[in-house]
Amino acid sequence: MRSFIHKTLKPSPFLLSTITTATLTPLSISQLHPNHVRSMSSGRIFQLKLDPLTGKSEWVVIEEEDEAHDAPPQQPLLAATSYLDMLNDSRRNRAFREAIDKTITKPCHVLDIGAGTGLLSMMAARAMDSAMSTACSSSEGAVTACESYLPMVKLMRKVLRLNGMERKVRVINKRSDELEVGVDITSRADILVSEILDSELLGEGLIPTLQHAHDKLLVENPQTVPYRATTYGQLVESKYLWKLHDLFDVEAKASDDIRLVPTKKETILCVKAQQFAMHCDAIKDEIKLLSEPFKIFEFDFWKRPESRGETKLHIKATNDGTVHAVVSWWILQLDCEGTIYYSTGPKWISFPFNMELQRTLPSSGDWCDHWKQCVYFIPGKGLPISKDEELHLHATHNDTSISYEFETQARGTEIDQYEIARDDQLILPPERVAIYGDSNWRWSVLKAVKKAVQGKVSSLCLVVDDSVFLTIAIAHLSKTSHVIALFPGLREKGAKYLQAVAVANGFSMDQIEVLGKRKDKLTMHDTHQKKVELLVGEPYYYGNDSMLPWQNLRFWKERTALDPVLASDALIMPCKGILKACAMSLPDLWRSRRCLSQIEGFDHSAVNATLGACGDLPEPQESPCLPYFIWQCGENKRLSEVFTVMEFDFSKPISQCFGKAQVEFTEARICHGFALWIDWVIDVDNSIVLSTGPDQRHWKQGVKLLAEPVTVGTHGSSLGNTSAEIETSFNPSSGELNIKYVFT
């Protein structure tokens, strides 16, 4: 699960003085990455944590203590990761169990890298016991579980004890590349079982992990589970995918004068040239297939892989159209004979001539979030093609990623590719690029800015977040205003970008000042002895894309801290935030987060509280609220009208807030939880409101899943509960939103 490179969902933060006395919010851990985890003495690590309401980070200590004391602090560490979703993936679990049973036929040394809860290690130990009893062998085998992340190691030991496996599996709390034969393990391993795969296949460090294992930890010609992984791709046309990356051409159609991407600077604001994980089935009706699926790379686990590889593919177009993206996925062959497979392919794929592969494809009940398809955007407007035209695709890979480059035989030249990053280039997430290209969003924001600056002369405007759009818009629309941009995430990069686009947007850099460094508080010295008349934010904070919606109330906290430099009649934009919610049917998402019991014969009930599962958790524990793009969560349906839960008034200092609402159900169905988000009221007249709800596909919503699904019905029906009462409270110190509900 996790080995050479740590990679989990990005949590949400809370400034801590000690790990043992504080309760963390869900999503409060920095992305687990070698730079964010530091080893100390044995049984102790540093973990980087971020406070969502200040943007500050701090190293805290996680110690290996008695399990009786570590349950409360550990829950948030792992509840926001993909472990629970992965363990609920029955297709995956079954495939690994069948392959391990088939591969381990005699006593041997098995190494499990990135062992997680120890599921594969226990499968290996059980298979070895069975093989030994069948063969009546007197020799002994061994199973070694290698897991580098201390909270996961502690959880694995609980699971092993619960299943009576603690003496059959040896646990080592190290990275796999730190293991030494003769020091950590007595001999090289005969069999490797491992699952260190992400949606792209390589992103969790599969290649360097296998390289080190073959060099230092495995016998020559070892057996492995999985045996092989093959990546596949398909060319697609999709305007939705195009708008996620090509801001230059999308913006050219805008009716306003703002140019975030001016002519001859087409890549100055763009997405990273990489594959992006996405549930492509959710947009299948917006995709036009332009080719048959094609094989790209094969990676054999049983031999040492190369760090770099390339292949040139000849692909025949099956339709006229424009190639906007390469959609890719992978298929695992888990056994050497080729009878056990697992696929992450989209549901529109079929293998009519290979029933073994056909059975690997996900069905309607097989949705999972830990492995998705991947999308690689074709630069610019895409590549126009004609049916039966032959396309040349050059695919390359390095240690951790796969990339693509097109060349057309007719033209004999490569199409424009992503430029090498420059100092003034901004790399933003696809959803942020799409927001900046959305004509309705731009119109609303510009209308609000025009109203705000109208009649103001030589005013001081303060942009508190990372909004380059607002900064440019104010400077463009108010030539006499002076704009100070804090850019807490973009910093100097944002300043260089503004300088590069200033001429195209009709403003001078004399109008704009980027502080370029984080400051706890601004003083009158920073504002040149002037009071701020306009304080604005979208709000958008660079790098916080995986936060819960209400953690953008950092804007409110920063507005409060800036009170000493605000004019008495200062205009705050947005002026208000409204917490909205609706009841949802989310069967696929709920199944992926449900409590675990038996997994292929092994009791995993010990992990439920720690992983934040939905179900019968001991009081007062409950599953956390987590951020999701609801439209990508498999089957989903709204069961109520949208209702207001709570309001946040930014004209006043940040404070604790409470809200209560009664909701009537509009659909007779099974309710799995509630979606929550914030609508930002931009102007004081309440006439311009920007919603971030489920209908807006570029924002994540917070999802509060129920402990158990509830049957609901409409008013007057006899089919279950007809209404629910929601109570919420917001903690301004931690950024936590507490949610309680009662069905009636």
Model-found features: residue ranges?
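Class I SAM-binding transferase module
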Residues: 2, 33-113, 118-744
